[in-house]
């Protein structure tokens, strides 16, 4: 296909498909039709900036429809037709557009797409991209502008930047530093043990988490005098675990990060700080409390074949005045952003509905997203049957998928 002189796109709130078309087709000129509503959402600015900054697009970008004196509402037939007869007609003449342009009718209101497509003497062909949930291959349907007869397909590249997809919706993207413990060679085996321990009543086979976690969790939730700096957890508090084996196990945990002696062992037991204000202390507590589960899920996704460019962790998506929450895991598969909220367990203060609300809050105004809760089996096991049924019903009503992560095979429901 020869280079396209002029490519028109009707911007909407969901523009990933059109963005990918621009990258693959490389038209000389991209013309963004921007209604007043879309301009108010700032979608045109994000689209233009992302395309210009992609380093893959080399054409020019033009905008029409939102400027003062030539605004397009795009919802009523008479208003659209009047705009087409005046503003659009003048615009095409100024840009020497005559039977040398392509209109992508994927976005916008149906009536706007229909009336634009009906303009004679402008279009070489029409393009349409269906939302292809079940296909790894993304393609564009080509249509004759008058008869609407199919003219073939254009297969798009499977290479696409997840960050670019996010930039179409977020005004700013911040990357939070990952927990450095995940780089330690012992962290993954310990994460596997932590996962296994959720279904264990007593320590066995060198896995002492069933003895350690209740003691740590009790210490972390207890109130202490303001002037107290440290806590001593004596060996007998860890129940049936033998002190010599317990020391070796706790040393492994302590050595996951340089704690500079603030968490240490002595002849009486384990010494912990009361406060975890310092970064390394906070990283250690966070990993033991839940970051281990994120590390495990990330590893399983990679083992299931998810590519680096399809996967992001720890992003904060800022939209307007909303600072947004940090996302656990983000995927891009089959032309769709997938927001994953992970939960290793629920604290006594948490409710089953909390992760549901969190994944909705993270993904608001982010286009046609897929929302997924990846939960450790212990969450379902600990819930009352009626409570769990109600939770499943609420998730289904909000089109949120639940994955009980019993193993890496369970995560294939996310990528198949």
What are these regions (language model features)?
Residues 1-50:
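N-terminal beta-strand-loop-alpha-helix module at the start
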Residues 107, 133, 137-180:
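Beta-rich, aromatic/charged-enriched effector core domains that present basic-aromatic interfaces
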Residues 9-13, 34-37, 105-107, 316, ...:
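Structural motif
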Residues 165-416:
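Intrinsically disordered, low-complexity Ser/Thr/Pro/Gly-rich regulatory segments
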Residues 29-102:
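A broadly used, surface-exposed interaction patch
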Residues 101-102, 120-143:
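Short, acidic/small-residue loops that bind anionic groups at enzyme active sites
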Residues 3-9, 25-33, 59-63, 100-103, ...:
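Hydrophobic beta-strand segments of well-ordered beta-sheets in folded domains
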Residues 108-123, 388-391:
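Short Gly/Thr/Asp-enriched flexible loops that form oxyanion-binding sites at enzyme active sites
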């Amino acid at each position: 296909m020869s280079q396209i002189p002029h490519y028109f796109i009707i911007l909407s709130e969901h523009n990933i498909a059109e963005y990918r078309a621009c990258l693959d087709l490389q038209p000389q000129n991209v013309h963004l039709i921007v209604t007043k509503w879309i301009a108010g959402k700032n979608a045109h600015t994000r689209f233009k900036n992302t395309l210009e900054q992609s380093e893959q697009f080399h054409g020019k970008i033009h905008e029409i429809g939102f400027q003062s004196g030539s605004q397009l509402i795009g919802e009523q037939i008479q208003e659209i037709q009047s705009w087409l007869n005046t503003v659009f007609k003048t615009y095409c003449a100024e840009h020497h557009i005559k039977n040398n342009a392509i209109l992508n009718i994927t976005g916008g209101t149906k009536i706007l797409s229909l009336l634009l497509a009906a303009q004679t003497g402008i279009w070489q062909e029409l393009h349409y991209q269906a939302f292809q949930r079940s296909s790894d291959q993304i393609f564009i349907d080509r249509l004759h502008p008058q008869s609407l007869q199919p003219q073939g397909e254009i297969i798009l590249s499977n290479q696409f930047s997840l960050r670019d997809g996010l930039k179409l919706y977020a005004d700013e993207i911040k990357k939070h530093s990952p927990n450095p413990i995940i780089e330690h060679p012992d962290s993954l085996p310990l994460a596997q043990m932590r996962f296994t321990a959720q279904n264990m009543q007593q320590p066995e086979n060198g896995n002492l988490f069933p003895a350690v976690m209740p003691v740590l969790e009790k210490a972390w939730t207890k109130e202490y005098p303001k002037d107290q700096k440290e806590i001593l957890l004596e060996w007998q508090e860890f129940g049936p675990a033998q002190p010599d084996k317990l020391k070796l196990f706790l040393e492994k945990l302590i050595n996951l990060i340089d704690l500079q002696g603030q968490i240490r062992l002595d002849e009486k037991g384990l010494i912990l700080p009361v406060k975890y204000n310092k970064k390394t202390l906070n990283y250690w507590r966070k990993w033991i409390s839940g970051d281990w589960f994120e590390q495990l899920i990330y590893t399983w996704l990679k083992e299931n074949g998810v590519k680096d460019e399809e996967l992001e962790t720890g992003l904060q998506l800022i939209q307007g005045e909303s600072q947004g929450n940090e996302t656990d895991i983000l995927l891009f598969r089959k032309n769709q952003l997938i927001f994953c909220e992970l939960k290793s367990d629920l604290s006594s203060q948490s409710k089953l509905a909390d992760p549901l609300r969190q994944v909705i809050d993270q993904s608001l105004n982010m286009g046609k997203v897929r929302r997924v809760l990846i939960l450790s089996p212990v969450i379902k096991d600990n819930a009352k049957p009626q409570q769990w049924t109600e939770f499943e019903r609420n998730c289904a009503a909000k089109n949120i998928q639940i994955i009980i992560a019993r193993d890496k095979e369970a995560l294939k429901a996310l990528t198949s």
